[in-house]
Amino acid sequence: MSDEIIVVSTPYLPGHKITKTLGFTWGLIVRSRGLGRNITAGLRSLAGGEIHEYTQLLNQSRQEALDRLKEHAATMGANAVIGVSFDSSETGGVMTEVLAYGTAVVVEPETGAASPVRLG
């Protein structure tokens, strides 16, 4: 059911009207980088450039946080989440926290003329 949740970073959903605002929704994950990744990344950082192990870990964490956000929104009865943002922080030097958050809403397609794009 969470696969059907529409997720956007904008405060509105073009072509849809918000019929109900359900409130704040989020998805959180905390992951340990692990000793092996820390050693590999530490060696790679000596040469400079991108640390692929951490990039992969953060991409996976962002996706998991987004999946959890959608699951939480679905339990609230939402079919969309607007204003989605991400935040991340490091905890204890070995763990990374990724938070996805937004506003759970119920939307329905607008009928008639196309909606103007609102900026700002």
Swiss-Prot record:
The name of this protein is UPF0145 protein Mboo_1021
Family affiliation = Belongs to the UPF0145 family.
- Reading the lineage from the top rank, the first entry is Archaea
Top-down, what is the taxonomic lineage of the species of origin? Archaea, Methanobacteriati, Methanobacteriota, Stenosarchaea group, Methanomicrobia
Q: Cite the Gene3D superfamilies for this sequence.
A: Hypothetical protein apc22750. Chain B
Q: List the disulfide bonds.
A: none
- Name the InterPro entries for this protein: UPF0145_dom_sf, UPF0145_YbjQ-like
